[in-house]
């Protein structure tokens, strides 16, 4: 599966929950319907909070005093929250949001001084890249709910999500060039989300773009007033959660698989996926329900 390939590319070891039944229920140590995730015994600080209910997992970047910087500890917390029970049928969609007026300011520059050393710097950027790849390879859609500033790796996080809803007060930038650190890793996601010349202007100047500009260029999916942001992101998530997990997972994987291909190969892959979709229990259930003029009953 794509999630397997994504982790293997980084030499990651599989956590024990992926070696168990793929439909195992959520463990008590993470979250349960309507409950928040308790702090674990790990020595590393938990810089995210999570909550899951009705198939929707909310992951909140919870370090507003540090502008929700994607420090190594934050990245590890986020990675853990994304990976947890990724194959569980209880999970249909993930929303990533943040506390405070800044969605994320990107990497913590205090971790990037010469005193930290090359090995530490390598771990920071490899972990960040792994998180972005996990979002792409995850079987369920991941929605960014942005209220405020998203810069550098924070902008990269938004660009990496499948869907992004932002408040009209949000803005986006890749300002690393201003401090002598070009946003090369954010450019990977940004350059795949917006036109090349738009991406390069953002990268070369470091100047921010507004939420409306981000919408126009395709960095985000929708702009809403701040007071409607949570409602709109939740509405989208609930709609996704009401659908067949297996059908959506196949569709997401196929979309990203065909995207870099030439037209002929893309249609070949998509045609195969359509046939595979018809072999799914929910594929036949949906068609039969339509013919019988009733609501489909999804297996998960």
UniProtKB/Swiss-Prot annotation:
Renumbered residue ranges of the record's region Disordered: 32-54
InterPro entries registered for this protein in UniProt: ClpP/crotonase-like_dom_sf, Enoyl-CoA_hydra/iso, Enoyl-CoA_hydra_C, Mitochondrial_ECH-domain
A biological-process GO annotation: positive regulation of cellular response to insulin stimulus
One Gene Ontology CC term in the entry: mitochondrion
SUPFAM superfamilies: ClpP/crotonase
Keywords for the protein's UniProt record, in alphabetical order: Fatty acid metabolism, Lipid metabolism, Mitochondrion, Transit peptide
Localization per Swiss-Prot or TrEMBL: Mitochondrion
Major localization listed first in the record, in broad terms: mitochondrion
GO MF term (any one): enoyl-CoA hydratase activity
Signal peptide: none
Modified residues (N6-succinyllysine): 110
Residues annotated as transit peptide in the record: 1-66
Family per record: Belongs to the enoyl-CoA hydratase/isomerase family.
NCBIfam families noted in UniProt: PRK08139.1 (NF006008)
PANTHER family membership: ENOYL-COA HYDRATASE DOMAIN-CONTAINING PROTEIN 3, MITOCHONDRIAL, PTHR43602
Function according to Swiss-Prot or TrEMBL: May play a role in fatty acid biosynthesis and insulin sensitivity.
Name of the featured protein: Enoyl-CoA hydratase domain-containing protein 3, mitochondrial
Organism this protein belongs to: Rattus norvegicus (Rat)
Gene name in the database record: Echdc3
């Amino acid at each position: 599966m794509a999630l397997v390939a994504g982790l293997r590319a980084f030499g990651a070891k599989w956590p024990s929950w992926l070696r168990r039944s793929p439909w195992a229920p959520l463990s008590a140590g993470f979250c349960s319907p309507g409950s928040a995730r308790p702090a674990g015994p790990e020595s590393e600080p938990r810089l995210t909070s999570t909550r899951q209910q009705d198939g929707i997992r909310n992951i909140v970047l919870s370090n507003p005093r540090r502008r929700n910087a994607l420090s190594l500890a934050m990245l590890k917390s986020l990675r853990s929250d994304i990976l947890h029970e990724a194959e569980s049928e209880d999970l249909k969609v993930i929303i990533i949001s943040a506390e405070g007026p800044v969605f994320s300011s990107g990497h913590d520059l205090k971790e990037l001084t010469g005193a930290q050393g090359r090995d530490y710097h390598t771990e920071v950027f490899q972990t960040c890249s792994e998180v972005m790849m996990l979002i792409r390879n995850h079987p369920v859609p991941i929605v960014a709910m942005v209220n405020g500033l998203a810069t550098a790796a924070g902008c990269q996080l938004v660009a990496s999500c499948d869907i992004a809803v932002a408040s009209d007060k949000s803005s986006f930038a890749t300002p690393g060039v201003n401090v002598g650190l070009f946003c090369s890793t954010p450019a990977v996601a940004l350059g795949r989300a917006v036109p090349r010349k738009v991406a390069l202007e953002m990268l070369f100047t470091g100047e921010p773009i507004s939420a409306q500009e981000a919408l126009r260029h395709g960095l985000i999916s929708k702009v809403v007033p701040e007071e409607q942001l949570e409602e709109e992101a939740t509405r989208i998530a609930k709609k996704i959660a009401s659908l067949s997990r297996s059908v959506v997972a196949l569709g997401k994987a196929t979309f990203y698989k065909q995207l870099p291909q030439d037209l002929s190969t893309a249609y070949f892959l998509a045609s195969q996926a359509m046939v595979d979709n018809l072999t799914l229990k929910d594929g036949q259930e949906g068609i039969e329900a339509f013919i019988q003029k009733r609501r489909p009953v999804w297996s998960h």
